[in-house]
From Swiss-Prot:
UniProt xrefs under CDD domains: IF2_eIF5B, IF2_mtIF2_II, mtIF2_IVc
Database matches in PROSITE patterns: G_TR_2, IF2
Taxonomic classification: Bacteria, Pseudomonadati, Pseudomonadota, Betaproteobacteria, Burkholderiales
Top-rank lineage group of the source organism: Bacteria
Keyword terms of this UniProt record: Cytoplasm, GTP-binding, Initiation factor, Nucleotide-binding, Protein biosynthesis
Family: Belongs to the TRAFAC class translation factor GTPase superfamily. Classic translation factor GTPase family. IF-2 subfamily.
Protein name: Translation initiation factor IF-2
Annotated ranges, domain tr-type G: 492-661
Organism: Polaromonas naphthalenivorans (strain CJ2)
């Protein structure tokens, strides 16, 4: 990596946009404007220090950086059929940089690309494998130490090279200085020679002037010229010697420098080769250790030693031509390992790939190469059909035989419902084995049929395994995590009070007086058919009230009210005393473990006896405080308001004793009191918050339904934003109408809420299907023997979930052995067109309880003759359905004697038989009536009349005191004095 890069290149390395990097550089104090601006190492250090400071970490002086680069490539490999297959290969490269003292980053370690290839496992003794693994580990440790020593040597060599370079620079400077001095001396010599020549020229005319030349002395000019030549020659020789000396010295310096560089280069290359060799040896040692570990952990297989030469040649589309006399290539024993030098190459051998390719190569015949000799009977395509058929016999495929293991007892966790295939998978056997065992147990099942928990556990025990009751895949376990994470402070909360008692004892009127509102007048028939929730502010604090129905059909509603409450107000009318629903309310309160405050109502009526009421309550186990019990008795009048304040004081006193607390700053939890389907708002649920705070927008899980709270209303219909503990509210936004009595909770993860709701819905469905299947199999023969049973199919649509539940239970109780109520569907909301279509298909009666049908549904019902009945009071619905079922009952048959006649004469007529002449002694004789023949007060014959005549005319009836003639049908053994008794069979309607 270069020391100077541009902003754009550095941003690409960091996977950031150049604009973001420029902003960070500007914040770090590095002024960069464009992406093409250069970026130095100091700028990068400033940016790194700024980022460390901004993230709150101390910038450490990092000496070593390792970069890991992963790249995925693909190679094409041809199988035995010639088709190319693409194989992904992942290559991992590592590069380590160490910061030197001179500030440069030098790569000290570059890991070879690692290609993931499956190790070939060879069978060996465990002790030998352990020894080899230890040896490989020691070898790897030795390589690591050698690598550390090599790094230290390299550092020392670098320091020595730096010192030698400094000394070399000094020698070069000295040589250059000497060369400069030699050049200067040569220049000085040349200058001196020039000056001498010039002086000689000046001397020549002076001599001519002073001395007259003799005719015999012409040698003066020759001597001067010779002297000049000598001087020039001496200067040139001196200059050339100095230049030669400088050149020789420079050449010597250059040769020394080149030798030093060559030596350094050779040492560097040798060190690099040694590092590569060490790295390669280290990689091989680690690979060998990994192979040994894989061999230790791999299951043992029994391998067949035979390997066909044709199969041993992998990855070759066209087999090489082998001469008939040539020797076949030797088969490498146990897949010979790759050569040591080929470890760094990207080679993917086909024998290291998936075993399915080996199977394909073994099963399918290879394509013969061009020019290969044709050998008959060896699988060649020119050898005829016999050769093709016999080709597979010579090739023995690789055996995948697994040594048999002894039976292993498994712990099988059985949920509430499980299919046959899932149960077989848990026991690691085939589904057919489970089906066989179930057939032995007398159950005919299919592979996808759900089994209940008891049946599945019996099968597991029969198969020899251990059955455990569990639901490991239950996502509801995550709900506990969310609850445990909340550690909020518990604060005092308002009590939740449930008003219970018999019907028409004044529960709603009492609550109405407390709330100062007219609630009872709004209920149909003056009786409560819904569970109501209200909260009231009193001088001593807030109290939340739950008003439950008193009718016997609303048992489930009362049970829910008792479970959600803190205190129960048991309302008993002073004139009626303890009634059946009063006893039931006491049982619900005892089961819930809540204190009871008894309110004896209607004390303003004349002729009441409070002591009688107290005695009846003591008989049921509710003992007043004045008798030494724990239940306060308060006489009240909902009409005049007498005793209401005392009742509230007793309730708040009980609440103080209980010390009711709940967390406020946590996720809300509570109970679904009531639910209905509103045509405009969708599913609406009345919930009571028991802990935490419910807010608009929270994700709520209620049973098998979920949703986000879109709106919240109080009991007066006013919108609110939050609801704390003990506050009843109406919420909207659920996906479906929840079941009344379900727990609801607020969770933070909507995806997890959806998973839990889906799991609960599927669990409910599977449990229901399993129960239905079991009942069908068990009751199959009993239904055949019972004969035809009349069914009354009904569809119930109610306004709220509680009313629908109560009405359905009341109507199902009307079923008898002859007429059964078949509940096709029950739901909440108005009667829609789909409900009418369901009634048409099932021939059911539609019952609307406080609901009506829309225009399309009414029109379709009229066109198809569907009966829709509307009710507001549960009594009327039960009574009318009871009458309808009574009409479906088979009427009873009853005999009624209408008259007697005495035989006084017998007439024999051919072709007719005996004709009896009779006198009607009592009642009347009719032609259509049945007759009994009595002889000596013993019945001899019972049958019908063939004819009845008075004189010669046919008669329909003959009254008392008249004579008649009659003939019995198919009977002639009559005697004088026999008595004929006439009777009719009448049908009498039955009632339930």
């Amino acid at each position: 990596m270069s020391s100077t890069t541009t902003v754009a290149e550095f941003a690409a390395e960091l996977n950031k946009s150049p604009a973001t990097l420029i902003e960070q550089l500007t914040s770090a104090g590095v002024a960069k404007v464009q992406a093409s601006d250069p970026l130095s190492e100091s700028d990068k250090q400033k940016l790194l220090g700024y980022l460390h400071a901004s993230h709150g970490t101390v910038a450490a002086d990092r000496k070593k950086i390792t970069l890991v680069k992963k790249s995925t490539s693909e190679i094409k490999q041809a199988d035995s059929t010639g088709r190319a297959r693409i194989i992904p290969v992942q290559t991992i490269k590592k590069r380590t940089f160490i910061k030197r003292d001179d500030g440069s980053d030098m790569p000290v370690e570059e890991a070879q690309p690692e290609v993931l290839v499956a190790p070939q496992v060879q069978a060996a003794a465990d002790a030998e494998l352990v020894r080899r693994e230890d040896e490989a580990n020691r070898h790897a440790e030795l390589l690591r130490r050698q690598e550390a020593e090599l790094t230290e040597k390299r550092r020392l060599r670098d320091e020595q090279a730096a010192q030698e370079a400094a000394r070399e620079r000094e020698r070069e400077a000295a040589a250059q200085k000497a060369q400069a001095e030699a050049v200067a001396q040569a220049a000085a010599a040349a200058q001196a020679a020039a000056l001498a020549a010039e002086a000689a020229k000046k001397v020549k005319p002076t001599i001519g002037k002073i001395f007259k030349p003799a005719p015999v002395a012409p040698t003066a000019p020759a001597i001067t010229v010779e002297a000049q030549k000598v001087i020039d020659t001496a200067a040139a020789e001196k200059t050339s010697k100095a230049a030669e000396a400088a050149t020789a010295k420079a050449a010597e310096t250059a040769s020394l420098q080149a030798a030093a560089k060559a030596k350094a280069t050779a040492e560097f290359q040798a060190d690099a080769a040694k590092a590569v060799d060490l790295q390669e040896r280290r990689r091989k040692a680690e690979a060998e250790a990994a192979g040994i570990r894989a061999m230790l952990s791999a299951p043992k297989r029994v391998l067949v030693p035979h390997v066909d030469p044709k199969i041993a040649m992998k990855g070759t589309l066209h087999k090489p031509v082998v001469a008939p006399g040539a020797a076949k290539p030797a088969v490498p024993a146990a897949a010979a390992p790759a050569a040591p030098g080929a470890a760094g190459k990207k080679e993917v051998k086909s024998e290291n790939l998936s075993s399915t390719w080996k199977d394909d190569a073994a099963k399918k015949k290879g394509i013969p190469s061009r020019g290969a000799p044709v050998v008959p009977g060896r699988g060649n395509f020119r050898a005829g059909p016999r050769g093709r058929r016999s080709s597979g016999r010579d090739v023995r495929p690789e055996s995948n035989f697994v040594a048999p293991t002894e039976f292993k007892v498994l712990e099988v966790h059985v949920p509430e419902t499980i299919t046959v295939s899932e149960l077989a998978h848990k026991m690691s056997i085939k589904s057919s084995e489970v089906i066989k065992h179930l057939m032995k147990l007398g159950q005919m099942v299919t592979i996808n049929q759900p089994l209940d928990q008891d049946t599945a556990m019996i099968v597991v025990e029969e198969m020899g395994h251990t059955a455990l009751t569990a639901a490991l895949d239950d996502p509801e376990a995550f709900t506990a995590d969310d609850v445990q994470g909340q550690q909020a402070e518990a604060l005092p909360r308002a009590p939740v009070v449930t008003v219970m008692g018999h019907v028409d004892h004044g529960k709603t009127s009492l609550l109405d007086y407390i709330r100062r509102a007219k609630v009872a007048s709004g209920e149909a028939g003056g009786i409560t058919q819904h569970i109501g929730a209200y909260h009231v502010q009193t001088p001593r604090g807030m109290v939340s009230f739950l008003d439950t129905p008193g009718h016997e059909a609303f048992t489930a509603m009362r049970a829910r009210g008792a479970q959600a409450t803190d205190i129960v107000i048991l309302v008993v009318a002073a004139d009626d005393g303890v009634m059946p629903q009063t006893k039931e309310a006491i049982k619900h309160a005892r089961a819930a473990g809540v204190p009871i405050v008894v309110a004896i109502n209607k004390i303003d009526k004349p002729g009441i006896n409070l002591e009688r009421v107290k005695g009846e309550l003591v008989t049921e186990g509710v003992v007043p405080e004045e008798f030494g019990g724990d239940s306060p008795f308060v006489p009240v009048s909902a009409h005049t308001g007498a005793g209401i304040d005392d009742l509230l004081e007793q309730v708040l006193l009980q609440a103080e004793v209980l010390e009711l607390k709940a967390s406020v700053d946590s996720l809300a939890k509570g109970l679904v009191i009531e639910a209905r389907l509103d045509k405009g708002r969708g599913p609406v649920a009345t919930v009571l918050v028991q802990s935490g705070t419910l807010k608009a927008g929270d994700v709520v899980l209620a049973g098998s339904t979920y949703g986000r709270v879109r709106a919240m209303l109080d009991e007066n219909g006013k919108p609110i934003k939050t609801a704390g503990p003990s506050i009843p509210v109406e919420i909207q936004g659920l996906t479906e109408v929840p079941q009344a009595g379900d727990d609801f909770m607020v969770m933070t993860d909507e995806r997890r809420v959806r998973e839990i709701a889906t799991y609960r819905a599927g669990k409910f469905r599977n449990t229901k299907l399993a129960k239905q299947q079991a009942s069908k199999l068990e009751n199959m023969f009993s239904d055949i023997n019972a004969g035809e049973v009349k069914m009354l199919p009904i569809i119930i649509k109610a306004d709220v979930q509680g009313s629908q539940e109560a009405l359905a239970q009341s109507l199902l109780k009307l079923s008898t052995d002859e007429v059964k109520v078949q509940l096709v569907y029950s739901g909440v909301g108005g009667i829609s067109e789909s409900d009418v279509n369901l009634a048409i298909a099932s021939k059911a009666v539609l019952i609307g309880f406080n609901t009506r049908a829309d225009a399309q549904a009414r029109k379709q019902a009229e066109n198809n003759g569907i009966d829709i009945r509307y009710y507001n009071i549960i009594y009327d619905a039960v009574d009318e359905l009871k009458a309808a079922m009574s009409g479906m009952l088979t009427p009873d048959k009853k005999e009624e004697i209408i008259g007697n006649a005495e035989i006084r004469n017998i007439f024999k007529v051919s072709k007719i038989g005996s004709i009896a002449g009779c006198m009607v002694t009592a009642g009347v004789v009719r032609r259509t009536a049945k007759v009994r023949l009595l002889r000596g007060n013993v019945v001899i014959f019972t049958g019908e009349l063939d004819s009845l005549k008075r004189f010669k005319d046919d008669a329909k009836e003959v009254k008392e005191g008249f004579e008649c003639g009659l003939n019995l049908k198919n009977y002639n053994d009559i005697e004088v004095g026999d008595i004929l008794e006439f009777f009719e069979i009448k049908e009498v309607a039955r009632t339930l």
